[in-house]
Amino acid sequence: MLSKGVLSARLFNLIYG
């Protein structure tokens, strides 16, 4: 469950970095 959140946050940071 946490993995999904972490992955989502990472992707958001990479895209909206």
Swiss-Prot record:
<protein>
    <recommendedName>
        <fullName>Protein YchT</fullName>
    </recommendedName>
</protein>
